[in-house]
Structure formats: C-alpha cells, structure tokens
A protein has these predicted regions:
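Lipid interaction determinants
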Residues: 1-61, 68-151
Length: 151
C-alpha cells in the first residue's frame, strides 16, 4: 500500500524534482531514515565525501560519492555499500531507488524540514502545492481534488 502510494506521489512530482548535482541539497543536513527494525538512523553527508551514520547514539563513519552521469549516489555504510538512483529530490526529502530494483526505495527525510518524519503527508502536501490542487469533501465521504486556476 505504502509503496503504491509512494510510487504514485513520486510520479506526480517527478517534474518538480531537483538533482543531487546541486550538492547543497545533500551536504550538512540531518537526513533521517527509519530502518527495517523501525529504528531511526541519521546520516550526515559531509563536503569531504565522508558520511556520519548515527543509530541510537552509536556513530560510524562511512563515505559517499555522487555520479552525475548516472544520477546515482554511492553510499558506503561501513557494513555495506549501496548504489541508489534519484527518484525524487527536494530540500525536505530524498527518495532514491536501489539500483536494479523497481520498488525498493531508500527514503531519507530532512529532519529540519520534516520533524515528524511523515514522508507521505509531506509528499502529499508538496503534490497539492506544486499542482495547485484544492480538495473538497463530498457528502459520500470521498474527496475531490481539482486544479485551481487562481494563483
């Protein structure tokens, strides 16, 4: 369910995606991911290509590199290395797809912008803002969204 909803939101927002070629989006920000154990991990990408990884206060130092020709981010997490391709990028969220997969996402939220880490709500709000959508509650309980022509 979340994967389908996430894919739908990413498809609607892809024309508004930034790129990691502008490294100021990535560097020196508190990027946060909720891992498979439902624990929060924080990643801080440094200008010198080092990567600070923190989980439960335990820190490891990894490395990262960006390959603009492939729009891919290589992340060396000390225990493993992963290659991720850009799916959707903005100042609040990095949605990356693990290379060679269709639906295996690596999602990082900028905790300064999304303090509650609710990425679906953030993306839905971005979708409404970028696409100028206005929502209406219908009497049958459904919602109707239409594009607003007012700016």
């Amino acid at each position: 369910m979340i994967t389908a909803q996430l894919n739908n939101l990413v498809n609607q927002l892809k024309n508004y995606s930034a790129s990691l070629e502008k490294s100021n989006i990535l560097i020196d920000k508190p990027w946060t991911i909720i891992d498979d154990d439902n624990e929060i991990q924080r990643l801080i990408f440094k200008k010198d290509k080092s990567l600070i990884l923190s989980k439960n206060g335990q820190v490891q130092i990894g490395k990262w590199d960006y390959f603009p020709e492939a729009k891919s981010l290589l992340i060396d997490r000390f225990s493993d290395k992963i290659l991720c391709n850009e799916a959707f990028i903005d100042e609040g969220i990095l949605i990356l797809k693990l290379d060679g997969t269709n639906n295996n996402h690596f999602i990082l939220a900028n905790q300064n912008i999304i303090p509650d880490l609710n990425i679906l709500e953030y993306l839905n709000n971005q979708r409404k803002n970028k696409l100028n959508l206005v929502g209406f509650d219908l009497v049958d309980g459904n919602k109707l969204e239409v594009e607003s022509t007012e700016y």
